[in-house]
Amino acid sequence: MAANGTIVNGGAENTINDPGRGFLGNLTPSVIPHYAYRGREQFLCDYNAFSEQFNNPPNCADQWFIVTGVNKRIFDSNFRDPETGPFSNWCSYDTALELLLVRMPRSTTHSIASRTFHQVLLEALEPLRMGRALTCIGGGSHFGDMGGKGPDDAWRPIQLPPGRSRAWPAVVLEVALSEIQAKLCSDVRYWLRASGGDVKSVITLSSAAMHAR
């Protein structure tokens, strides 16, 4: 399996293919900071404190943190529908393990990376006369039994095979300020397993230059 120009090693494949519950369990506190959910006000305090560190490097190199103890009721009533603000800045929700992965707002560089990749993809498809075969469906969240997740960008064929659900993309893009192998594994694990095989490719982009934000 290829990701970001490298081959996912055997240990990573074991994580992706592990039959255990959930998909965020490998993001331990030693990998990504964890905060317990203790209500809306405390979440905002934790979010603002993390955001202050994130925006004042080198205090914090991470762009993500995990919120623990987020059951489905808490998720549905607080995080699922908001369109703006801290409560909308989650990128993955693990129903089984009650874990919510929150990401700092996308930087300009981050957005440019997504748009640039989209253009490169279209240019690569044009000689094959497939430039209009794919439609970009953006970064909206996709929900399944495992939880929910939103990519940085996603594509699917304009004409789907008979019986193929429109609920899932065929190709997803994940952009990271820094590549964390455990995060990459959780991304791939969700897309390949939750979609029931409808997602065929997970592409990751990582650039140290993005740290300039």
Model feature map: region roles:
Residues M1-R213:
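Gly/Pro/Ser/Thr-rich low-complexity, intrinsically disordered segments predominantly at protein N-termini
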